[in-house]
Amino acid sequence: MSRVNPLSSLSLLAALVLAGCSSQAPQPLKKGEKAIDVASVVRQKMPASVKDRDAWAKDLATTFESQGLAPTLENVCSVLAVAQQESNYQVDPAVPGLSKIAWQEIDRRAERMHIPAFLVHTALKIKSPNGKSYSERLDSVRTEKQLSAIFDDLISMVPMGQTLFGSLNPVRTGGPMQVSIAFAEQHTKGYPWKMDGTVRQEVFSRRGGLWFGTYHLLNYPASYSAPIYRFADFNAGWYASRNAAFQNAVSKASGVKLALDGDLIRYDSKEPGKTELATRKLAGKLGMSDSEIRRQLEKGDSFSFEETALYKKVYQLAEAKTGKSLPREMLPGIQLESPKITRNLTTAWFAKRVDERRARCMKQ
């Protein structure tokens, strides 16, 4: 997904108007749960070695209050588990080999646009707003926050930067929970603090990274039986675990083997993807047209998909064919791809690791 770098003036105005004035009534507690004091639990659960532990506690307490989240041990430990997994509680974690990754991205863009590398490297020797050349800053960059700032300057100040990147900053995630910047830009409503800059810059702060990361993890309705499926969704996108289970049902009913990745349609095209084509094979039994199937699959990024006729009928067909009840939640089978990842990792691996951390947190 492309990430728009500057926050539009309209979004900024909305964020400023909403800042500091939006608390919601907390979500109802589940049976057997009890409310906790979020700040006290964070101070208790975070290692004493964490810098600004008190500030983390206050920011997370404000996050829970402003988003109306149920203040439970499971929810707090879930957020802490993601932050520990993603950054080891560092607001702006260092990324090994980030300078090399950045230069490779620049060279890749130049090659794609048929611009000689030496021209690009020469252009980057000019002085940037902080007094150092862009080359010097790229050579010494250690964190995504630093790299994002370099690209912001490069895009806004240097014609070559605009040629290579347009208005799109290639740094796509940030902060202590490594939340998507595009996601944050789309979910500013209710943000409780005044923003001094863009949403992108806010994501790289402790409070912003926690607020948007927690929103992505907990602030959507789901029918999951365990937190591990939210952890998978955090990595793969909202409802990926539910949608992977639905793909499994489509596969059982149609006989078509599908990748259980949680993507029900092609979001980059109106052309049908493999899941949509497999579902179309069931059109006669479903009593639905191709266009009806498409319209209902498009609800796959919302909770309401579970209430569609398509969702219910596919499970009826699949369970009748297999003679057994099928799961409504599955860990998606997605290979994690990023220049920062040097091992063979999957969404399921991520979800299980985070869930182990959550369980340890709750037992402490």
Question: Which ranges hold each PLM region?
Answer:
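Bacterial N-terminal signal peptides that target proteins for export
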Residues: 1-11
